[in-house]
Amino acid sequence: MFPKTVKVGAHKYKVIYPYYFIEDNELMGSSYQFDGTLKIAKLSFDGTERAKDLIKETFLHELIHATCDIYERIEISRSDDNETIVKRLSTGWFQVLKDNDLLLDKKHEMPKSVKIGGFKWKIQYPYVFRDLTSSAMQVDYHHLTIRIGCAIETGLQASNSFTKHCLINAILKCICDSLDISKIGDDNRILSSLSEGFCQVFMDNKIQKIIRG
């Protein structure tokens, strides 16, 4: 169900599944940067097998913990509301990755729309902004539209990795706003840092294929 290892930034985590939390049978997963492990439970606290999607969501939850540890340790991982933030992020991202094909493995391709929560967002790509350095992505809440830049008027083309990051950035912004994660959604620095992390983790480890498989 899961790969043996996942790459988060420069770190490689070993995925241990199924793992049995003998010390605490109510624990469903754990992420430790120190020993580089993600541990995922197959059984619930009563000894019965958990639903497949719940196991996958736990994997994603712990992977998000690892991503926050590497890309935004001070503001997120060490905050008092860390677990609440990560739970909302994993809930939001699981739905997005499950319900949409984000075409992360297709160069210079974008989905025409993406369902985020109960809303269907239109994606305008390729979109030409006047200046990509000041505006490469735009989230239009009034028209449920995400615009992603591909070039500027001078003809300079955006790279594939740049446009994929813009897509992840826009979706993360929408998730944070819909699930009230203001600590990320209202801070462009944290938003950009974490979206960079999610883009790397999702693409390098083919996470969407795991969630949808």
Tell me the role of every PLM-derived stretch.
Residues 1-53, 70-158, 178-213:
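Metalloprotease/metallohydrolase-associated module, dominated by Zn2+-dependent proteases
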Residues 57-69, 164-177:
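Active-site recognition of the HExxH zinc-binding catalytic motif
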Residues 161:
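Extended, structured, electrostatic nucleic-acid-contact surfaces
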